[in-house]
């Protein structure tokens, strides 16, 4: 009985402490390298041919009249004709703040902050190489809109080099999607062979202004190769060492809470995933594709995809089989994935994420009910053994070895497993942690309302009502469980403080997580009533 209480106390406090630490770490600003260390790492032999971006606003961007605007049902994008870079991207269906109409801005380039997506052609005859500068494209219009009944929207940019070669860069937008096809069509009308190589990179200010730091969790790079399915590569990593990994396919991305931007070259192409840090304090991560030799009179098409949007696992998986891993559930991903699937399944029927969380809770408690019943039965048997255990303690005194042997014989004789009540507790801990990560990482819960005062299940309860109710429910559960007379007084006091400690812990947890714990406690109270009634009929109290 006492050992079960000890495990419950230690387990709950340990898990809560871990989650509290993680929550605080997520909310705290990420440490960044000093500017001197960043500048020291600028030199890079493997990315020197990839053009750098200005730290401020380029003249072409400042004179916003020159920007090409693209509007679809999901994206509001601005493209700089110099280089054909995406310098602004707003997500139409996702709002900056709940209740406001302003769309969420993911990519932007301002005086103090840069987060853009570049792509171009480098190599010996590259029109975007550092030596030659960036290509200045022309286009037939400066505004493009996806019309009703139109599934795709093409935005063609054209550049004619001095040698007469025509380069066409085409952005293809799709209805209902956040991925953009970026295609190059090269028509070599010159008398000499051409050698080019496509690249795509994402540039972001390492020290973004406060207004740009919209989300509290991980912000930094990530990549995937043949050898590494998924790995985060934060700004400190980039400052210390440049990536230079050859792979077939792969992708490179910048992550932040709920949102991601990623370059995804064709899975069958040989690519190099690279990173660097520029002297202006910009972190760069991207890919360099295969080198293409284009004979005189020949044509060549080179393609890639760019994703800029929410961490939608279905959409990301459709682009690359590993891109959905940017939804990072931690070491319990194998448990979090089915929980997320079940959460989505329930929500598709009830249309309310809070109700879906309640259904998840009922499902978990229902599955664990046989174990919960075994737990309380074991605890009741242990309580009935307390007089006999007290006799053993009096008989053997300080002889721990004989005392232990006698206790084991007594347990065997009475068919009692002293650890039998711990299994439900042990099983609930990973479920709790996995659900924590699901609620923290799943973009679907961003701005998802429940009812009454809970307007966003992904953030803390603004009035702390749920944590207080959760504390009350824990207090009721505690009062329902008899305390063994042999229990140490210090342990009794610690158990009495548990509801208070947990209430304080949960004040800043996502309200969806607190809702799960509160409903779980209510169900547990009902289960206790039912189980105890059955045990009393059997003479077990």
Curated annotation (Swiss-Prot):
Gene3D superfamilies: 2.70.98.90
Keywords of this entry: Cell inner membrane, Cell membrane, Chaperone, Membrane, Protein transport, Transmembrane, Transmembrane helix, Transport
Gene Ontology CC terms, in alphabetical order: plasma membrane
GO biological process per UniProt: protein insertion into membrane; protein transport
InterPro entries per record: Membr_insert_YidC (IPR019998), Membr_insert_YidC_N (IPR028053), YidC/ALB3/OXA1/COX18 (IPR001708), YidC/Oxa/ALB_C (IPR028055), YidC_ALB_C (IPR047196), YidC_periplasmic_sf (IPR038221)
Listed name of the protein: Membrane protein insertase YidC
GO molecular function (one): membrane insertase activity
Assembly notes: Interacts with the Sec translocase complex via SecD. Specifically interacts with transmembrane segments of nascent integral membrane proteins during membrane integration.
Function: Required for the insertion and/or proper folding and/or complex formation of integral membrane proteins into the membrane. Involved in integration of membrane proteins that insert both dependently and independently of the Sec translocase complex, as well as at least some lipoproteins. Aids folding of multispanning membrane proteins.
Keyword Acetylation: no
Membrane-topology annotation of the record: Multi-pass membrane protein
Top-level division of the source organism's lineage: Bacteria
Membrane-spanning intervals of the chain: 6-26, 325-345, 349-369, 420-440, 457-477, 500-520
Subcellular location: Cell inner membrane
Family membership noted in the UniProt record: Belongs to the OXA1/ALB3/YidC family. Type 1 subfamily.
């Amino acid at each position: 009985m006492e050992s079960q209480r000890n495990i419950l106390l230690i387990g709950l406090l340990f898990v809560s402490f871990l989650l509290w630490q993680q929550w605080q770490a997520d909310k705290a600003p990420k440490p960044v390298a000093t500017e001197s260390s960043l500048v020291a790492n600028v030199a890079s032999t493997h990315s020197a041919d990839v053009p750098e971006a200005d730290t401020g606003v380029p003249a072409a961007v400042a004179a916003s009249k020159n920007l090409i605007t693209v509007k679809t049902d999901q994206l509001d994008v601005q493209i700089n004709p110099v280089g054909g870079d995406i310098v602004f991207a707003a997500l139409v269906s996702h709002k900056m703040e709940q209740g406001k109409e302003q769309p969420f801005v993911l990519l932007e380039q301002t005086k103090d902050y840069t987060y853009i997506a570049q792509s171009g052609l480098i190599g010996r005859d590259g029109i975007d190489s550092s030596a030659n500068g960036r290509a200045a494209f022309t286009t037939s219009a400066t505004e493009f809109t996806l019309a009703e009944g139109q599934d795709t929207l093409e935005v063609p940019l054209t550049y004619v080099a001095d040698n007469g070669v025509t380069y066409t860069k085409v952005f293809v937008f799709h209805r209902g999607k956040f991925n953009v096809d970026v295609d190059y069509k090269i028509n070599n009308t010159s008398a000499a062979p051409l050698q080019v190589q496509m690249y795509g990179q994402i540039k972001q200010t390492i020290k973004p202004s406060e207004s740009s730091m919209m989300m509290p969790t991980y912000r930094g790079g990530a990549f995937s190769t043949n050898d590494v399915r998924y790995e985060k590569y934060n700004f400190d990593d980039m400052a210390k060492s440049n990536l230079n990994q050859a792979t077939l396919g792969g992708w490179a991305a910048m992550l932040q809470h709920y949102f991601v931007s990623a370059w995804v070259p064709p899975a069958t192409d040989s690519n190099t995933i690279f990173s660097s840090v520029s002297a202006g304090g910009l972190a760069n991560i991207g890919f360099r594709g295969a080198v293409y030799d284009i004979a005189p009179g020949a044509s060549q098409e080179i393609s890639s995809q760019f994703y800029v949007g929410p961490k939608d696992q279905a959409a990301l998986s459709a682009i690359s089989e590993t891109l959905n891993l940017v939804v990072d559930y931690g070491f319990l991903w194998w448990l979090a994935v089915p929980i997320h699937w079940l959460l989505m399944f329930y929500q598709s029927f009830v249309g309310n994420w809070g109700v879906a969380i309640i259904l998840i809770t009922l499902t978990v408690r229902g599955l664990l009910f046989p174990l919960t019943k075994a737990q309380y039965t074991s605890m009741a048997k242990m309580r009935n053994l307390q007089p006999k255990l007290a006799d053993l303690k009096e008989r053997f005194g300080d002889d721990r070895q004989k005392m232990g042997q006698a206790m084991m014989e007594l347990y065997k004789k009475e068919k009692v497993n002293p650890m039998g009540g711990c299994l439900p507790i042990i099983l609930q801990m990973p479920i709790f942690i996995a659900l924590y990560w699901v609620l923290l990482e799943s973009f679907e819960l961003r701005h998802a309302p429940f009812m009454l005062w809970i307007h966003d299940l992904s953030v803390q309860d603004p009035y702390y009502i749920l944590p207080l109710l959760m504390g009350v429910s824990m207090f009721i559960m505690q009062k329902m469980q008899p305390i063994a007379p042999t229990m140490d007084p210090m342990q009794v006091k610690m158990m009495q403080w548990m509801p208070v400690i947990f209430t304080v812990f949960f004040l800043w947890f996502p309200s969806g997580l607190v809702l799960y714990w509160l409903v779980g406690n209510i169900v547990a109270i009902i289960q206790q009533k039912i189980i105890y009634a059955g045990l009393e009929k059997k003479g077990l109290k």
